[in-house]
UniProtKB/Swiss-Prot annotation:
The gene is AZR1. Induction: Transcriptionally regulated by PDR8. Gene3D superfamilies: MFS general substrate transporter like domains. CDD domains: MFS_Azr1_MDR_like. Transporter protein required for adaptation to high stress imposed by low-chain organic acids, in particular by acetic acid, and for resistance to azoles, especially to ketoconazole and fluconazole. InterPro entries: MFS (IPR011701), MFS_dom (IPR020846), MFS_trans_sf (IPR036259). It is a multi-pass membrane protein. Residues 92-102, 156-163, 211-221, 320-329, 397-414, 465-472, 603-613 are cytoplasmic. It comes from Saccharomyces cerevisiae (strain ATCC 204508 / S288c). The chain crosses the membrane at residues 71-91, 103-123, 135-155, 164-184, 190-210, 222-242, 299-319, 330-350, 376-396, 415-435, 444-464, 473-493, 582-602. This is Azole resistance protein 1.
Length: 613
């Protein structure tokens, strides 16, 4: 009737959804074979380029379209990266307010763990729904988590908000690199990955400064409120300027003018997939959605892997703090965690490929495909990245703690000391991208970066309460060089190992790119918790040995609170104990970098494919 709002039936939404699905599938042509014959050679160069926005002319985006898409991706990635680094300067204030320093590592891990575990899932979600729709959904989830964190009234609520933000941040990080890699040819991906990595590094610069200013001048809650306007800007930039299939400036502007209808199409597309799942349960019973969960999204491996790593991290968190290391609770958590992770690997590598339905359905692939991961060129660089990230996040976090706990610096002043580390990360990422573009070499960059990591971590162990101002700057440069070089090169080194002629190249490309993100984020998650455990255990042991009794008991929480309210100089007994405990953390980081170098040496010598111009 006139005046009544229009409603959509199941069939209506199915129709619109099928229409959106057909358009999405048309836009997601992934393979373009370009053949180039020259007069000077009889050889035919073949370059297979993965494209997410293949148009009718099969041309990659250029000019304004390319730059606008990259800006949208870079800002989205900046948003996710900002939330990692901005919390490094609020640790003391949050611990003081909630009295939970032993759980402070979960400010990083609560964000990084879902970032790691869900990295492999986001690519699977994006394939049927569309990369654009999925990216927008990820930004919305991230914003919800940020708002919860800003309003938190307890450590548990704050960690919960960080977990939700981590779910969205994971989608942003995973899809940014997947989408970005489809916008240019293989030979130019090094530069593109460097540009996106720089947005991460710039967030690393801005994050601690913003966190320090907010914590010192306003409140630490603004470290999360600031994500809301930045996230809104990223959302609309990506909504307007990333449009697969549109190759000209005029087409993009026409598309922006059609924003209402475009937004409705996105909602209809998402609604179609949700109703399709609902329709399966009503019309076809439980079998088809169950099969999709088991084989399309590999839910069994995901549950085993998530539960396993969560148990392991909980054991590291509570061990030596709430429970003794040899207590039954900690031992059981370790055993269950390790068993579940091993079962996840066995299931994906050995059991999953044996199912007949998997053999008959090409798009049913495990989250971690042994066919790809077992390749030395992929396995070695990603393990090296995992170890480097674990060491780097440990150094990054406790460098801030060094200046706050030993010298009683404010959050803002402590953040200033990170500039040397972060600038070296940015410069290295850009330089490595340019070198790869010119020489097509990757392994030398990976090995040299790992060597710098070992040397830098070794030198950083000299950072104690006797170090002078020049040491405060110089000792932080090499860790940034190591992280910037390896984070930029490992993804490209993994991608070039894939067979471009394989019928599963598209899914393999997405899988390997997200696996690289998985290793990076898992390294940060484990590094954040393990470094917190090492510091706490070392500090308690040294306090007990020195027979120092704190007013409210010998715990790391009481140590930090007492130090803040009763600062007695950098060379006092407490100052020496904290300095020695921080040195133990830096030695742990050195161990991570040393292992990373071993794997980097065995990286593949394969070069990047030359561009056809």
């Amino acid at each position: 009737m006139k005046g009544e709002p229009k409603t959509y039936s199941m069939s209506d939404l199915s129709y619109y959804g099928e229409k959106a699905q057909q358009q999405n599938e048309k836009q997601q042509k992934q393979y373009v074979v370009r053949r180039n014959s020259t007069q000077s050679t009889s050889k035919q160069n073949v370059s297979v380029v993965l494209e997410d926005n293949a148009s009718e002319s099969n041309e990659l985006p250029k000019g304004f379209i390319l730059y606008a898409s990259l800006i949208a991706l870079a800002l989205s990635l900046f948003l996710a990266a900002l939330d990692i680094m901005i919390v490094s300067t609020i640790i003391e204030e949050v611990a003081k307010q909630f009295g939970s320093y032993s759980e402070i590592g979960w400010l990083f891990t609560g964000y990084s763990l879902p970032n790691a575990l869900l990295a492999l899932i986001w690519g699977r979600i994006a394939t049927p729904i569309g990369f654009k729709e999925t990216m927008l959904f990820a930004i919305v989830i991230f914003e919800i988590g940020s708002l919860i964190s800003a309003l938190a009234n307890s450590m548990s609520m704050l960690i919960g908000g960080r977990v939700i933000a981590g779910v969205g941040g994971c989608g942003i990080q995973s899809l940014s690199f997947v989408i970005g890699s489809t916008l240019v040819e293989e030979s130019q991906r090094g530069i593109l990955i460097a540009v996106l990595s720089c947005s991460f590094a710039i967030a690393s610069v801005v994050g601690p400064f913003l966190g320090g200013v907010f914590t010192s001048s306003v409140t630490w809650r603004w470290c999360f409120y600031v994500n809301l306007p930045i996230g809104g800007l990223a959302f609309f930039l990506f909504l307007f300027f990333y449009n697969p299939g549109l190759s000209t400036f005029q087409e993009t502007m026409d598309n922006i003018r059609k924003f209402p209808s475009q937004f409705i199409e996105i909602v209809r597309n998402v609604a179609y997939h949700l109703l399709k799942i609902k329709g399966f349960s009503k019309l076809n019973g439980w079998r088809k959605p169950f099969m999709e969960l088991i084989f399309m999204y590999d839910i069994i491996e995901f549950v085993f892997c998530s539960a396993g790593f969560t148990c392991i991290l909980l054991a590291f968190t509570f061990g030596g703090n709430r429970y003794a290391w040899n207590s039954a609770s900690i031992i059981i958590l370790f055993i269950i965690g390790i068993v579940l992770v091993v079962l996840a690997g066995i299931y994906d590598f050995l059991v999953f490929p044996k199912f007949n339905i998997v053999k008959a359905t090409p798009h049913y692939q495990p989250l971690m495909s042994w066919t790809n991961i077992k390749k030395p060129g992929i396995f070695t660089v990603n393990i090296a990245l995992f170890l480097t990230c674990a060491g780097y996040i440990s150094q990054f976090t406790y460098i801030v703690q060094y200046f706050q706990l030993i010298y009683n610096d404010s959050a803002w002043r402590a953040a200033v000391h990170l500039v040397a580390c972060i600038i070296s990360t940015v410069v290295t990422a850009i330089l490595c991208g340019a070198i790869t573009d010119k020489t097509r070499q990757i392994k030398p960059i990976i090995v040299i970066s790992s060597i710098f990591g070992v040397v830098g971590a070794g030198i950083l162990t000299l950072l104690n309460n006797n170090a002078n101002n020049s040491a405060h700057i110089g000792l932080l440069i090499l860790p940034g060089v190591a992280f910037g070089g390896l984070a930029q090169s490992s993804m490209l080194a993994s991608q070039i190992q894939l067979d471009k002629k394989s019928p599963t190249f598209r899914s393999d490309f997405v899988s390997i790119t997200t696996f690289n993100t998985f290793c990076k984020n898992l390294g940060q998650a484990l590094g954040g918790v393990i470094s917190n455990t090492v510091f706490s255990a070392a500090a308690i042991k040294k306090l007990t040995k020195a027979n120092i009794q704190l007013p409210d008991g010998t715990t790391v929480d009481n140590l930090v609170i007492y130090r803040q309210t009763n600062f007695d100089g950098s060379h006092s007994k407490l100052g020496n104990i904290i300095s020695e405990s921080l040195t133990d953390v830096f030695y742990m980081a050195l161990g991570f970098y040393a292992l990373s170098l071993i794997f980097a040496v065995f990286a593949s010598n394969k070069k990047v494919t030359a561009s056809l111009r």
